[in-house]
Amino acid sequence: MTKNIHKHRILILDFGSQYTQLLARRVREIGVYCELWAWDVTEAQIREFNPSGIILSGSPESTIENGSPRAPDYVFTAGVPVLGVCYGMQTMAIQLGGKVESSNQREFGYAQVEIKADSALIRDIKDAINPAGEAVLDVWMSHGDKVAEIPADFVTVASTDTCPFAIMANEEKRFYGVQFHPEVTHTKQGLRLLERFVLGICGCEALWTSATIIEDAIVRLREQIGDDHVILGLSGGVDSSVTAMLLHRAIGKRLTCVFVDNGLLRLNEADQVLEMFGDKFGLNIVHVAAEDRFLSALTGVDEPEAKRKIIGRVFVELFDEEACKQEQVKWLAQGTIYPDVIESAASATGKAHVIKSHHNVGGLPKEMKLGLVEPLKELFKDEVRKIGLELGLPYDMLYRHPFPGPGLGVRVLGEVKKEYCDLLRRADAIFIEELHKADLYNKVSQAFTVFLPVRSVGVMGDGRKYDWVVSLRAVETVDFMTAHWAHLPYDFLGRVSNRIINEVNGISRVVYDISGKPPATIEWE
């Protein structure tokens, strides 16, 4: 019998911080299931979820503004431990009788927190001892307001020079507030502090591991699907690949994967997908060779959004055609992951807690009436990759750089033609190969080549050539919301340029994109 991996669970109430999903990922990393809901949940919803503990997130808002978000009152009467982080600490203080004020000295960045009193939250956790003999924590602050007065039944656990209440606690009720962000890596002992709260104070067991997630998913898939057949659109990307492997382990040959080769994939990618999933893992794959259909639909179209829509529409049409041939199929599987669920959820305040399906494949014929199977919908991307490794998928495939859904359709600028795609595929393969050789591939977050539909004069031997231009793009980023261009070595860039111009007949010039995000986007289209 499988363990109930959802037995202990943490509820994180989201007040809008950029770090909230990171907070949830840290709790999962500790080995405990958690969910992320908007701050405006009802008492009934919290009771139904039955959390072992509650965490109140940070927020870009100010607790002293009229109408700023507050935690439901039930949070403080539910009888479970509560941890307030930054804004979460401030709203806890206000709601329990304390005071918050705007600070003249805002704290953004590193700070040293001095421990003033013992607390279960940080006992034996420290980075150093200061000259006064106090334990010190190196933390990451990001706040303008600060708690000016803690609630009557709380004690001051830690402070900084400018923030008198950096940690507050009510040990009896197991309520804790920290003015810093324990979820970011800059707070050196942050994970230990969260671990102490989740495992020690809330009493959760670390049941949430890659192996137990797989075991649980297989049991649930078998219960949901029974003896029915399932269809899945397999792209070779991380989410659909892990979905395919999980379903294959659960129901074997009753899974049919439809792989649509749109002619917009990377060099040899179609062969690699078919070889890995068909030959190596023995999945049942329907290969749809559709390059002509996609390129024909894209003829004369040069506007990026129009190209995206056409590629999406043609994919859905092809998938529908194949799905209709599979008469025994009763279920459609999708690689929806937890951030998709969070994004597509909405509440009265425009924040997320109402869980709705996020459709990766839309527009299926109404007469098909397929049920939906989403085995990854509770998982973050890093968790999906880890269970992919556990299921036997290769590291290089799971951890390769992101590739856009429309593929080369948005990396060939302007109108998409077969000639352009073929040139781009070969140039991009050289760039990626050289990054691996130089041990630079995993040091950048994303790298790729873009085809520019302009010709440039070049010289080869005694002759002149008038051929196409490609741009290399490599960026470094944490969250893909902002990015810096990667400062790759000049000799490396020179080597890549020489190889592309010499080995790819039809390209006469290679340039390197040194634009950050913002103002530029990572992809060119």
UniProtKB/Swiss-Prot annotation:
It comes from the Bacteria. Residues 208-400 form the GMPS ATP-PPase domain. Residues 9-207 form the Glutamine amidotransferase type-1 domain. Keywords: ATP-binding, Glutamine amidotransferase, GMP biosynthesis, Ligase, Nucleotide-binding, Purine biosynthesis. It is an enzyme of class 6 (ligase). The keyword Plastid does not apply. Its EC number is 6.3.5.2. One of its GO terms (molecular function) is GMP synthase activity. Homodimer. This is GMP synthase [glutamine-hydrolyzing]. It comes from Yersinia pestis. The lineage of its organism: Bacteria, Pseudomonadati, Pseudomonadota, Gammaproteobacteria, Enterobacterales. The gene is guaA.
